[in-house]
Amino acid sequence: PNGCPRRRGRQTYTRFQTLELEKEFHFNHYLTRRRRIEIAHALCLTERQIKIWFQNRRMKLKKELRAVKEINEQARREREEQDRLKQQQEKKLEQQQQQQQQQQQQQQQQQQQQAPPQQPPQQHHTISHHLHDQHKLGLEKAPPGADLLKAVAKVPT
């Protein structure tokens, strides 16, 4: 009414138009004027409609990429937090194991201090006595695999 052209309503595109525009966008996010004219004629749309569709599609892509980036950042932060918690748990477990080892060592030291010193058992036999015992039993000349029961039977009781 006041000399300004009336704004058109929202343009709805057919499935075919949308598919063709998406295919073109897949290869080129920006169009030359010549290509815009070709697409407009092929799809029975105006150059302005093609230009606006591509602007909107670039904004949609930008928004999607921002959302993906945010999801990845959130996943990275969660992963870092999980790693940090895992390291804390491992450190705590390691400290507990060290404390247990120290306690065991202290207990062993206390037990050793409280227990009377043990002397190793004394051996009264000498090699010559051992050889004498073998001679007495007749073992020194026994062929390999000889019946040991015979030798045991000769042991004085």
Swiss-Prot record:
Give Gene Ontology CC terms: nucleus
Pfam families given for it?
Answer: Abdominal-A, Homeodomain
Give the Gene3D superfamilies listed for this entry: Homeodomain-like
Q: Name one GO biological process term.
A: negative regulation of transcription by RNA polymerase II
Q: Where is this region: Disordered?
A: 73-157
Do the record's keywords include DNA-binding?
Answer: yes
- Which GO MF terms does the UniProt record name? DNA-binding transcription factor activity, RNA polymerase II-specific; RNA polymerase II cis-regulatory region sequence-specific DNA binding
Give residue spans, biased composition: Basic and acidic residues: 73-94, 130-139
Q: Protein name, please? A: Homeobox protein abdominal-A homolog
Q: Which organism is it from?
A: Schistocerca gregaria (Desert locust)
The gene for this chain is: ABD-A
